[in-house]
Structure formats: structure tokens, C-alpha cells
Amino acid sequence: MKRNLIKVVKMKPYFAALMLSVSVLPAYAGPLGTADKADLPQSNVSSPMMAQSLRQPDLQPISTDRKTECFRLYTPDRKPGVNCVPDGSTGH
């Protein structure tokens, strides 16, 4: 009984912090967006559909001046029946 009580006492600060974060912190959160309803475009049947487009400053070129080098790794000659490891390419 005493052992379980010690575990509960150790966990109380954790649960207290969890309860505070769940109950109190959302009250301090600000609004998700700052756009007013007047700023949002109103759509109706007569207004044409408009696709979203990127502005020119949003497009930036990606530098492709990276240099890569390929290295060939040494692999020993595989001979089925001679090597201890069977050759996977021939199935032997």
C-alpha cells in the first residue's frame, strides 16, 4: 500500500501539469486567423472559378551546381560452387 502511495505522489505533478495544459492553456490561445469575413472572396453562381496562381517572387530557382562522384566498389569474382556464399544471380 505504501509503495503504491509513493507512486501516486510522484505522479501528481505530472497530472497537475497535464490538466493545466489541457484546461487553461487553450484559453490563452489567440485566434487562428486574422482575416475578416470582408477579406474573404465571396463566390456565387455568376462569379467565375479562379485557380490559385503563384506570384513571380514565390518561384525561386534551385541551384544545381552540386558535383557528384561515382565510385566503383570492389566485388570479388563470384564463381558458383567455388565461393562459400551461393551466387544469387545464377540461383546456384
From Swiss-Prot:
Signal sequence, renumbered to the chain: 1-29
Ranges annotated as biased composition (Polar residues): 41-55
Region (Disordered): 36-62
Listed InterPro entries: YjbT
Key words, A-Z: Signal
Family: Belongs to the YjbT family.
Protein name as annotated: Uncharacterized protein YjbT
Organism: Escherichia coli (strain K12)
